[in-house]
Amino acid sequence: VWAWNTALAWVCGDVCVWKPSEKTPLCGIACQNIIAEVFKENNVPEGVSCLINGDYKVGEFMSKDSRIPLVSATGSTRMGKIVASEVAGRLGKSLLELGGNNAIIVSPDSDLKMTVIGSVFGAVGTAGQRCTSTRRLIIHETIYDKVKNALVEAYKQLKIGNPLDESNHVGPLIDTLAVDSYNNALNKVVEEGGKIIVEGGVLSGNGYESGCYVKPAIAEA
């Protein structure tokens, strides 16, 4: 998200200041180091791309600063409302990419193998923490059972563990707050009459000491 927004701005001759999520600062530093090398090789002034690490207070400061004509923000809907209000209050511009509820529609003539591969990767890749993570499947009734059974079998084969181990499919959630949200979501499914067809749960024991490794679950509504 940072790359495609800033690249357009740079091409148009603008300077960019980036504040990554306080939960993933190393990713921001790595990206900044890469672009710094590219700029140096092409004699672009160092300050054209700047990085500021910090918590939400840094974001608030940037939203209110009239020297920043356009603020691009990616995150939750709650965050987006705050940014939009602050930037609009100084007649600035905002570009928001906010949380959603992404779905895959599965029609009767869908390729079952590709459907399962795409759905599983979309749902469990990066432990379901991408803004583009698959959260729902809308399946035609004529193939519903076939797709459901295939997904259940696929989930049984998932390996959960250290993401630095390439044999694992699913890594940890970002922190214990995310684990709480995960548990609350599963509880809400049951409370609202849904059916859990692939059981979730927090993993414990050797390799799972952080308490942030969870089992991907599937709910039927």
Where are the model-predicted features located?
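Rossmann-like NAD(P) dinucleotide-binding subdomain of oxidoreductase/dehydrogenase enzymes
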Residues: 1-114
